[in-house]
From Swiss-Prot:
Binding of Zn(2+), residues: 888, 891, 908, 911
Source organism (scientific name): Streptococcus pneumoniae serotype 4 (strain ATCC BAA-334 / TIGR4)
Enzyme Commission code(s) on record: 6.1.1.5
Protein name per Swiss-Prot or TrEMBL: Isoleucine--tRNA ligase
Keywords for this protein: Aminoacyl-tRNA synthetase, ATP-binding, Cytoplasm, Ligase, Metal-binding, Nucleotide-binding, Protein biosynthesis, Zinc
Length: 930
């Protein structure tokens, strides 16, 4: 036997290298085969409910890192709730209707207008479901636990029926109406868009300054006067029917030198405009308040059949332009509102494809709206005072990335204005984890217009509206519920397969259809109405969920998207918000803080991370960032996270190895019988348990990450485990001192594995497989550790906090000695301590082998003053010299008792007593040479 064989060196087959990319799929299959998700739900039946409702990602393409961050975050929350005494099922979902799928089919050569609509919709459905399958596998590969066999999908008959019923309740309450208000219009999609489908980009536009000649000055202005107007949308002059001024803005009547004409502009802008127009020696003839100009009539710049009325509007400012804006009620919300109030014509001169129509005039007809600037300039003639190119933030179609226009077309609207205050009151009851999120959603609802819910597309849920022979729209409870039942049985494609009369209840009559003839609506619903109905289609209709949901968790862009649409439909139907809490996340940016895009080549696919590092590293990364704001991710950043993971793994591997001979049922030492340092570590770990449990409850992942890493690096690695080897390796295998420390090791190992499970389920299960005395098959079926209370815990913490300060001072003394070549390693040191009464009392209270804690071979507590050469602090001083004696071959301490024993071992007296007591046969035979 060799002397080293008398050491209790930790033994384990738990691998140092994780091999996550290959092992994770194996574990995931094992969980699936064991029906782990279902078993967890069965285990928690009857416990308080917690419903995190999954916002549905769009089913198109593989998931990106933003999807991964979101779904991992949800998984961490649901897992932690399941392990904290809650029944917390998770139903993943997908959003499956809308233009992107139509665009994919178009790129594949499918020509929608050349084939049967029902066949086309079947292709859309097949493609959408194929993408659901693809993304389902992507999410499962991340280790996300959920009811993957029974997700919700917005194209299923039950969901579509639930959506129709949401619409029906809103219709019954009078919230659905038809109007021709201007809406965001995408010529590239040939459809109206909701606010949530708009994104803003910089756009360079031609802006024009031109003048309208006064036709009837109402006794205020002469007919040789011109009112100066500014526009950034020259094509809308074709539909201009008025000029809007600010009632309280000051305007001046001016005449530049050498100019026969007189002009009206905002007084505040005169200087800048004079420079822009090349006006010199400008004479101010008169000043007016805007309200004095009200109802003056001007000529249209070129259309002699049109007069333009000067009207008042609150939206006019002097921030730019001339303080006067031309008003085309068919091409803008403000224009429409002031136009209707003043009985202006709502002219629309652009068709659904962005092409100028006949009513724009023969010179414009057939031109694309963006290309008409030269024609407009030609038509303006000498009325044009200046033109310039400006760059401004402009709305774009979020899917096609093309600019959009405002355009008045007949659409179906949900009236938000009718119950806006109810919605705002409900927002006040919701808990927001970011206060700015509450402000953002509140302001959006407060300021938003009515919601245009109709779309002129094919792939979506039809609006369940019929038309009588006289054109009356029919949307009554009887017809809508009948449609819902048909959708529930056959799916929404039935709408296109049957005639209107076959979609109505048997025997249905309407006074507007004396001949019994009806037509059906051909528009579909906005996809935000689809996903915005999920609280009904899923949370209400699934018996395992509770409404309102406890939590909605999505990206911050959903304040104007899913959070918004869900809130409107839920309050409209039931008067309550669909969620009790909202947690929002920022966007995933690249390592430099730039937005990720395929064109820049800076995207990171979750599948690439899984191949290189494993999903576990992506999961740990999610906890390492403050996801309430935008976060950065790159392979370099993930490498750093991987290093942290390695540190966590190897620390836990040490605990596994050094409890391999520990049977908790037989070897556990009662808390009261632990050494002071072991009690301290137990209490410190208990603090970590509380911190992590509280952070899980508050969804504070970064707090968990920081607390965990700090405990492992500072409390364990840099302190407790640093001197632990002197105990667990050296002392007798069954000695009290070793069992005391193993008791703490095992307690930490089991509980920290549970604490890690929501974040690192693969690693936690791997560790669990090595804990033979734990009864649950899987750690995922266990509970998070409870927070404990220990006698005198505050006193113990205070004592050891003071000792840590003392230890830090001692380490400085040892470092100085190392630098002065007095010692090499700390075990070569004889440390002499010169304490005052405070430190002396502290060392007595610690009641431990202080030399062992400081990892020095010899320690002396001296009386009297310290020598001048000592390193002094306020309460203590230190001197360091080389320890006397020889190095013990077994414990490596320098000890004056070290000597060669009769059994061929050069060891100290302490090691000799251990060896002689525990290895009598080897002592009798003598040890082999090293």
């Amino acid at each position: 036997m060799k002397l080293k064989d008398t050491l209790n060196l930790g033994k384990t087959e738990f691998p140092m290298r994780a091999g996550l990319p290959t092992k994770e799929p194996v574990w995931q299959k094992e969980w699936e085969d064991a029906k782990l998700y279902q078993r967890r739900q069965e285990l928690n039946q009857g416990k308080p409910h917690f419903t995190l409702h999954d916002g549905p990602p769009y089913a198109n393409g593989n998931i990106h890192v933003g999807h991964a961050m979101n779904k991992i975050s949800k998984d961490i929350i649901v897992r932690s709730k399941s392990m904290s005494g809650f029944y917390a099922p998770f139903i993943p979902g997908w959003d499956t209707h809308g233009l992107p799928i139509e665009q994919v089919l178009s790129k594949q050569g499918v020509k929608r207008k050349e084939m049967d609509l029902v066949e086309y919709l079947k292709l859309c459905r097949e493609y959408a479901l194929s993408q659901v399958d693809k993304q389902r596998e992507d999410f499962k590969r991340l280790g996300v636990s959920g009811d993957w066999e029974n997700p919700y999908v917005t194209l299923t008959p039950d969901y579509e029926a639930a959506q129709i019923r949401v619409f029906g309740e809103m219709a019954n309450k009078g919230y659905i109406y038809r109007g021709a208000k201007p809406v965001y219009w995408s010529w590239s999609s040939e459809s109206a868009l909701a606010e949530a489908e708009i994104e803003y980009h910089d756009l360079v536009s031609t802006s024009l300054y031109y003048a309208n000649k006064v036709k009837d000055g109402k006794g205020v202005l002469d007919t040789d006067t011109y009112i100066v107007v500014w526009t950034t949308t020259p094509f809308t002059i074709t539909a201009s029917r008025g000029l809007t001024v600010g009632a309280d803005i000051d305007y001046v009547l001016v005449q530049p030198a050498g100019e026969a004409r007189k002009f009206v502009v905002a007084a505040e802008l005169l200087t800048s405009l004079s420079e822009k127009f090349g006006w010199a020696d400008v004479q101010v003839l008169e000043t007016y308040r805007g309200q004095e100009l009200n109802h003056i009539v001007t000529e249209h710049p070129w259309d002699t059949a049109v007069e333009e009325l000067v009207i008042l509007g609150d939206h006019v400012t002097t921030d730019s332009g001339t303080g006067i804006v031309h008003t085309a009620p068919g091409f803008g919300e403000d224009d429409y509102n002031v136009g209707i109030a003043n009985n202006l014509e709502v002219a629309v001169t652009v068709d659904e494809r962005g092409i100028m129509m006949k009513n724009a005039g023969p010179e414009f007809e057939g031109q694309f709206y963006e290309k008409v600037v030269p024609t407009v300039i030609e038509k303006l003639g000498n009325l044009l005072l200046a033109q310039e190119e400006i760059s401004h933030s402009y709305p774009f179609d979020w899917r096609t990335k093309k600019p959009i226009i405002w355009r008045a077309v007949p659409q179906w609207f949900a009236s938000v204005s009718k119950f806006r205050q109810e919605i705002l009151d409900e927002i006040e009851k919701v808990k927001f984890h970011s206060e700015w999120g509450k402000v953002r959603l509140y302001n959006m609802i407060r300021d938003r217009g009515d919601w245009v819910i109709s779309r002129q597309r094919a792939w979506g849920v039809p609006l369940p509206i019929f038309y009588a022979e006289d054109g009356t729209a029919i949307m009554v409870a009887e017809t809508i519920e009948h449609v819902a039942q048909l959708f529930e049985e056959y799916g929404s494609s039935i709408w296109w397969e049957r005639d209107a009369k076959d979609l109505l209840p048997e025997g249905f009559t309407h006074p507007g259809s004396p001949n019994g003839e009806f037509k059906k609506e051909t528009d579909i619903m906005d996809v935000w109405f689809d996903s915005g109905s999920s609280w009904n289609g899923v949370v209400v209709n699934r018996p395992e969920l509770t409404y309102p949901a406890d939590l909605y968790l999505e990206g911050s862009d959903q304040y104007r998207g899913w959070f918004n649409s869900s809130l409107i439909t839920s309050v409209a139907n039931h008067g309550v918000a669909p969620y009790k809490q909202i947690l929002s996340q920022g966007f995933a940016l690249d390592g430099k803080g730039e937005k990720m895009s395929k064109s820049l080549g800076n995207t990171i696919a979750p599948s690439d991370v899984e191949k290189q590092f494993g999903a576990e590293i992506l999961r740990l990364w999610v906890t390492s960032v403050d996801s309430s704001n935008d976060v950065r991710i790159s392979m370099d950043i993930l490498s750093q996270v991987s290093e942290t993971y390695r540190k966590i793994r190897n620390t836990l591997r040490f605990l596994i190895a050094n409890t391999s001979d520990f049977n908790p049922a037989q070897d556990t030492v009662a808390y009261d019988e632990l050494r002071s340092v072991d009690k301290y570590m137990t209490i410190r770990f208990n603090q970590l348990v509380k911190t992590i449990r509280d952070a899980y409850a508050d969804f504070e992942f970064l707090t968990i990450y920081k607390a965990l890493v700090n405990f492992i690096n500072v409390d364990l690695s840099a302190f407790y485990l640093d001197f632990a080897k002197d105990v667990v390796y050296i002392e007798g295998a069954k000695s009290l001192e070793r069992r005391q420390m193993q008791t703490v090791f095992y307690d930490i190992l089991v509980k920290i594995t549970k604490l890690l499970t929501p974040i690192l389920p693969h690693t936690a299960e791997e560790i669990w497989s090595y804990l033979e005395f734990e009864t649950e098959d899987f750690v995922q079926l266990s509970e998070l550790p409870e927070v404990q209370t220990f006698a005198n815990q505050e006193e113990i913490l205070d004592t050891w906090a003071a000792f840590m300060d003392f230890r830090g001072q001692a380490q400085k003394a040892l470092e100085e000695a190392r630098n002065a070549k007095v010692i090499g390693k700390s075990l070569e040191a004889h440390l002499t301590v010169y304490p005052n009464e405070v430190v002396k009392t502290l060392l007595e209270a610690v009641n431990s082998n202080v030399a062992q804690l400081l990892i020095v071979s010899e320690l002396t507590i001296a009386e009297g003053p310290a020598p001048e050469a000592a390193l002094s602090f306020e309460d203590v001083a230190f001197t360091v010299e080389r320890a006397t004696g020889e190095v013990c071959d077994r414990c490596r301490r320098i000890d004056p008792t070290t000597a060669e024993r009769s059994y061929q071992a050069v060891i100290c007296d302490h090691c000799a007593s251990i060896v002689e007591e525990n290895f009598a046969e080897a002592v009798a035979e003598g040890f082999e040479e090293k």
